[in-house]
Amino acid sequence: MRRKLIHLALVMLALFQMSTIAATPVQIEHQGLLLNANWQESAEPGRGPLFLIVHGTWAHGGMEIIAGLQDSLAVNGYESLAINLSLGISDRQGFMSCDKVIKANHADAAAEINRWVEFAKTLSDHIVLVGHSRGGNQVMLYQQQFQASEVERLVLIAPMTWNPAESAADYEAQVGRPLAEVMAQAHGDPNAIITAGVVYCPAAEVLASSFISYYDTEPNRNTPELLATVARPVLVFEGTEDPLASGFKSQVALFEKNQQVTVQWIDGADHFFRDLYTDELVDGILEWLQR
């Protein structure tokens, strides 16, 4: 009984510390766009590396999994910066909408991540770059194009996988139009605005070059392929209850010989690692950092 009371007291203390450390909005400029992020201090500033966190598809830095990661890292004494990719919109907040012309480009994330890395370098010489879902793939695209020595490690949480045949079949099933037909239209004039289903939007006005970035073979959106040649330490998390994880599991052979890559499965977790699974993520990350 006494042990349980002590444990409860420690948990309550941690929650109190967490509640007194509010995330601070940060804004910088990049190529004429205002970029937003949430800066989370910790109870013990300077304890370890700074975590720079990238959200998933058309999401934002305040979504549940990202905010949970920041809170858990803060309780453990680590500072973090959760960014909002602009998706082509200056001062973007919240989830992406289908109501306006979509100019988001999958590949543009790499340069925006680099802009935030440059900012983060003014705060810390040791950076861990974290990406969830599509953000995990975009973190890998970043590391292919930019080589900041301060970015020492990468963490990918349920990173995106991609198969061209499956993508085409899924697109036609969801939208009712062959993907090849829309791609031909988009390639005909990449600067045109076309009407098409794209990502989560069943029908939207979208810049043709943006559409291409989400459905063409380049940039490479199949993260297991990118892991084959990564030259810095990478930790990949997958949840056993994530229906999307099968695409990753089936391609482990592509990178299993690369000793830089560590894969950790979390039993019971789905794609978003909610509640206590978020703490398991952070525990796994911190244990990995000590190796």
Where are these regions (language model features)?
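N-terminal cap/lid segment of alpha/beta-hydrolase-fold proteins
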Residues: 21-44
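Alpha/beta-hydrolase active-site loop
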Residues: 100-122
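Short, surface-exposed "cap/lid" segments of acyl-processing enzymes
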Residues: 44-76, 80-85
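Short beta-strand/loop motif that positions the catalytic acidic residue
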Residues: 230, 236-238
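Cap/lid segment of the alpha/beta-hydrolase catalytic domain
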Residues: 86-104
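Primarily recognizes the serine-hydrolase "nucleophile elbow" in alpha/beta-hydrolase
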Residues: 119, 124-175
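Catalytic histidine-centered segment of alpha/beta-hydrolase-like enzymes
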Residues: 269-278
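Conserved alpha/beta-hydrolase "acid-adjacent" motif
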Residues: 243-249, 274
